[in-house]
Amino acid sequence: MKTAILTLSTLALLSTTTFAETKPNIPAKEASQIFKAAGFSKTKHGWEGSCDTGEITTYKDLNGDSLKDAVISDYSTMCYGNTGVGYHIVAQQKTGNWKLIFENMGIPTFLKTKGKDGWPDIENGGPGFCFAVYRWNGQQYKVHRYEYQGKACTLN
């Protein structure tokens, strides 16, 4: 019993310190534009979307066009079921404006494979064992294939 408690305590400590992700440093004006492009509104609790308060979890160039892109995550089992998370991908345009290009429920994993214009394929993770992989076709992200741990699978 003592070993189990010690192990759990150690894991809790490691997950909150060593492996903690740092939030991206985004200028306030830029963050405001990103949230607004995704349809979020500023409230006293933060930036709220149709489900819950969101946070920018990724802020970098995702497709190699030298412009920043952002991923906003929000969390709600009421909206997103067992997965509990949704995401919104916002891309900076050449004009400097931001545009929502994709949103979905699930946990996005950006893969090395790419669609049109250098946009990475997105594995849409969550509970289960076979996940949709979305590919950018120049207009939108659409389901391209299904895979689990890098191998093809089917939903049958």
Q: Where are the predicted features?
A:
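Terminal domain-start segments
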Residues: T18-K60, T154-N156
